Amino acid sequence: FECYERHFGHRPEHVCQNIVTAKENIPPHDLLVGGFPCQDYSIAKKGARGIEGKKGVLWWEINAILRAHKPRYVLLENVDRLIKSPAWQKGRDFSIILRCFYEAGYAVEWRVINAADYGEAQRRRRTFLFAFRNDTALFRKAAELICVEGLKGAHQLLLQDGFFAPIFPLYGFERKYSEGWLDEFRYLDLKDLSAAQSCHFYASGLMVNGRFYSVESIPLQFPYKPLCSVLETAPLAERYFLSAADIDHWRYLKGAKQETRHRRNGSTYFFSEGSMAFPDRSDLPARTMLTSEGSVSRSTHVVADPQTQRLRTLTPIECERLNGFPDDWTAGMPERLRYFTMGNALVVPLVKAMGKRISALAEDEQRS
């Protein structure tokens, strides 16, 4: 929060409080933007419980704000597994979210976007949801197209006339798709839906008037930025470099494993995982950064320093660059938190493009 205020200043409306108690103080607004915690949907966490998890339930606080204020537009973000959660009833959680939007009077378009596909230096896949109220011009256009053209109209929206296509163009679609209804004629209420609904959602999709259509999309790929494009070239502190004594441990962390391990209660289990590149290839975009970046862990990037060729971890500045932030955006906080912050962050150019798109929609709305 201090980092935010350092860049944007202090204002009375900047409230860093528990959303459960602070939501009553939220003023009227036209755009609701948020990202509810991802741990209960993430593949990085074992036993993730989805919308029922301790953090996944924060969706219901967003839903309460949605119903209380009825903003014209809503932009939300989460991990790519959101559309598949939970593992034992795939698509249930996302169906619940879509049904909530339907009941509140919104249509929704979603897209799973890999930042590297659109010219960024990180292979960071995230699910973005854009919801628009049923009295907006975009809603009327979507409803008319789907009513008249059916699935052909849905294709047109996803490929050309919807929210995401103008800023993140698609090459086309694969043959994988799903469609169905989430309205009260199919499921009496959320309890009924939660008990019975299971669906395979894909990377692109729409929900209008309770009907959803989802298809596996093929992005129109832009030239990507390789990891080497963000690496610092100035001499770096020794703490970033791997010592000779640590190399074997890093090789073990990154290597393939098939071994017997012991639980805390003394029982054993067989553990298996594949190998990772060591060091990371600098001619490709970086892997997805996690909040543990910079620590001694399997997921931490290790690169050959461009000046010395010695193996090292990424610096906080390099992590900022991977997300499109200016250098030293997080300066002033402990280094551990700088890595943690970037592991939680979005890729800025993607969000900036969405912001401009929303602004254009709002201007069109005023003219219509």
Where on the chain are the PLM-derived regions?
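Redox-cofactor binding/interface segments in oxidoreductases and associated redox assembly factors
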Residues: 17, 33-34, 76, 291
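Conserved SAM-binding loop
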Residues: 4-5
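C-terminal target-recognition/interaction regions appended to catalytic cores
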Residues: 200-368
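Class I S-adenosyl-L-methionine
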Residues: 22-29, 39-276
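Conserved SAM-binding strand-loop segment of SAM-dependent methyltransferases
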Residues: 10-17
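Short connector loops/turns at beta-strand edges and beta->alpha or beta->beta junctions
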Residues: 37-41, 71, 294-295, 327-328
